[in-house]
Amino acid sequence: PSIDTVRPDARVHVFLDETTATLYLDTSGESLFKRGWRFDKGEAPLRENLAAGLLALSGWQPHIPLFDPFCGSGTILIEAAMISLNIPPGINRPFAFERLRNHDSRRWQDMLDKSRLHIKPALEAPIVGIDLDPQAIDAALSNADRSGLDPTCLDFAVGDAVSTPPPSEPGFIVTNPPY
């Protein structure tokens, strides 16, 4: 049979130890932290799942204003907007199981459509990010656009964290500071 070794229909992993061989069928494909929207990265990119984890650990809730004074390519704020709007992570990315022979594409599409019914139309509170680097802000805007978010949903601007006050009070600051 003809097999595409770069992008096979099914990827099988074999793990061996002294007495056992374990076979795994890869149903995810790309790593799950890859949500399918972040192509533009800053100097110190933060994985999308780590950004979502930081937000969860911070105690931030969608009804509370959020500010990132070192937003870079916007990962934390885009994840926050997606959480706030109830957009499932990875809803727009392909998965490896979609190429499997017994995949029911109609059922999968029905599940995606049902999950989209729960997406909220607007944020409950402002989500604002600034960065000194205009290229980082351009990257954040591009990433937000690719994520499917309404461009007016997030407020990205070039600014200096030292001289720019948070846009509203009270609120949360969640950031990945430069080092």
Descriptions of predicted regions:
Residues P1-L55:
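Non-catalytic, mostly N-terminal accessory regions of nucleic-acid modification and defense proteins
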Residues E18, A161, P177:
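Residues immediately flanking
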Residues A21-L23, G74, G171-F172:
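Conserved active-site beta-strand-loop modules that form the wall/rim of enzyme catalytic pockets
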Residues N143, I173-Y179:
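Amphipathic alpha-helical repeat scaffolds
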